[in-house]
């Protein structure tokens, strides 16, 4: 058996086209959706991510602002800039690119973003709303994964879902969204005993660990849907995920590739969240 490939590029393109249509309609009403992306330092990977996000927004008709600051920017200055963006009516979404330099408290910086402009969904208020099943914004990567599962017609109600990785950015919100969809959810972390025993139970397996090719085909239930959130460079210098694609593809029923899987969906859902933030400004 060779797994069906879940094409994140094609799905994200359809979502971007829908965003462009809705953004044009909103702009015609006098509100052009606006996203501010804040980058501190010169991390090469972060620069690529930010460039891709800004380009995607502009292509879809959203107003985007990139604010780049030196790595030695003080926390007070960064917080002051976020406060100014909070008060700027032309900006509906604010994204601070992580990771931040070590001297900056990422929790404090995220908490400084107005919850209604927190399009990453990381603010503690938005995390709480997600936990209670009333999300204002769904974090972009888990949101993108849910859209991929939906596009594949995956039945989540009653399914065994296993999430490998328990970060605040992917693992925990991913588990909450799967739980809300009716799945029975197991979250695995670095302390999990016999990880393979857990992953082999999964009808839906989501992996977000940052460890190249750690999930191999013998750890996967035959026919499972495998979502690989990881993006790493292997020893050969090539991009790879947290799942060993070659062996997993022989066992899984469907699988996301790296690149071309979850990554494009993350950017697409950032645009959706920004659009929704702008649309809410027209709602009394």
From Swiss-Prot:
Recorded catalytic activity of this chain's protein: (6R)-5,10-methylene-5,6,7,8-tetrahydrofolate + NADP(+) = (6R)-5,10-methenyltetrahydrofolate + NADPH; (6R)-5,10-methenyltetrahydrofolate + H2O = (6R)-10-formyltetrahydrofolate + H(+)
EC numbers for this chain: 1.5.1.5, 3.5.4.9
Residues binding NADP(+): 165-167, 190, 231
Keywords: Amino-acid biosynthesis, Histidine biosynthesis, Hydrolase, Methionine biosynthesis, Multifunctional enzyme, NADP, One-carbon metabolism, Oxidoreductase, Purine biosynthesis
GO function terms (MF aspect): methenyltetrahydrofolate cyclohydrolase activity; methylenetetrahydrofolate dehydrogenase (NADP+) activity
Cystine bridges: none
Pathway annotation from the record: One-carbon metabolism; tetrahydrofolate interconversion
Swiss-Prot/TrEMBL GO biological process terms: L-histidine biosynthetic process; methionine biosynthetic process; purine nucleotide biosynthetic process; tetrahydrofolate interconversion
Keyword Hydrolase: yes
SUPFAM superfamilies tied to this protein: Aminoacid dehydrogenase-like, N-terminal domain, NAD(P)-binding Rossmann-fold domains
Cellular component, GO annotation: cytosol
Signal peptide per UniProt: none
Quaternary structure (record): Homodimer.
Primary role: Catalyzes the oxidation of 5,10-methylenetetrahydrofolate to 5,10-methenyltetrahydrofolate and then the hydrolysis of 5,10-methenyltetrahydrofolate to 10-formyltetrahydrofolate.
HAMAP family documented for this protein: THF_DHG_CYH
Family of the protein in this entry: Belongs to the tetrahydrofolate dehydrogenase/cyclohydrolase family.
Protein name: Bifunctional protein FolD
Name of the gene encoding the protein in the UniProt record: folD
